């Protein structure tokens, strides 16, 4: 009998992204192949300029790679035209960035519902789900608060709820704790990790704070556009986490 093939929610194959500059061709992402399963939370780390943010933008279907494949649920994002990539982004990808980009004049629940509204999926079930998700994130009493009436950590939780509300296959986070103090950062990432596992999403978080890797299943390290190391065991990951505490 043959061995069953693993079906990953996300798989990239030899992804390359180059830019032309006055000094020549810049290789921002250099032959990166990775896989993330449903229900797996992965951290992407590396020094400034390592290519991790460019890679995340490619995975979010915001940038097209120069070459390579990006398979999301088996569909190649790299071959899509701009219109189809926008549709894919709305339907299958959730993302939250360092700046949470909440609409300042919408309440917490309205900000979360906005993603469903954009997808023409805002019905009674969607409205109930938005409230339940915010309550799960500890914001049950903040549903009608505007962003300016919430702390940075609370705003980031609203952004997480918005990223998850439309049941995406892939959830991406770019430095979600950069503006938070350590205690709130831990709370946000621990909650985010729990939801990724609980809901069976594939999750990737870019972070400069190695301490936040405590809550992930694997750590992928980039340098000079290349994927140079993968930390898979708890001992390896906690060694990396502890190095960030010094």
List each language-model region with its residue ranges.
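Conserved beta-strand-loop-alpha-helix hinge in the C-terminal portion
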Residues: 226-246
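ABC family nucleotide-binding domain
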Residues: 8-215, 219-222
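Short, Lys/Arg-enriched N-terminal segments with co-localized hydrophobic residues
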Residues: 1-4
């Amino acid at each position: 009998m043959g061995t069953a093939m693993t079906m990953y929610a996300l798989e990239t194959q030899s992804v390359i992204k180059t830019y032309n500059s006055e000094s020549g061709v810049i290789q921002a992402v250099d032959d990166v192949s990775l896989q993330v399963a449903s229900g797996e939370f992965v951290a992407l780390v590396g020094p400034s300029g390592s290519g991790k943010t460019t890679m995340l933008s490619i995975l979010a279907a915001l940038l097209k790679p120069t070459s390579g494949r990006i398979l999301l649920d088996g569909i190649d994002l790299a071959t899509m035209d701009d219109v189809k990539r926008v549709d894919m982004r709305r339907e299958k990808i959730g993302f939250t960035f360092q700046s949470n980009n909440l609409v300042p004049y919408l309440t917490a629940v309205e900000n979360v519902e906005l993603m469903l509204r954009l997808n023409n999926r805002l019905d009674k079930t969607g409205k109930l789900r938005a409230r339940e998700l915010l309550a799960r994130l500890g914001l049950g009493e903040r549903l009608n608060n505007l962003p300016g009436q919430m702390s940075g950590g609370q705003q980031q939780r609203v952004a997480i709820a918005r990223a998850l509300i439309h049941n995406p296959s892939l959830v991406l986070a770019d430095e979600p704790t950069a503006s938070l103090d350590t205690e709130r950062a831990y709370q946000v990432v621990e909650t985010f990790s729990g939801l990724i596992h609980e809901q069976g999403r594939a999750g990737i978080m870019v972070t400069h704070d190695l301490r936040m890797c405590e809550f992930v299943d694997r750590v992928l390290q980039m340098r000079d556009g290349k994927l140079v190391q993968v930390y898979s065991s708890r001992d390896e990951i906690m060694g990396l986490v502890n190095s960030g505490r010094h």
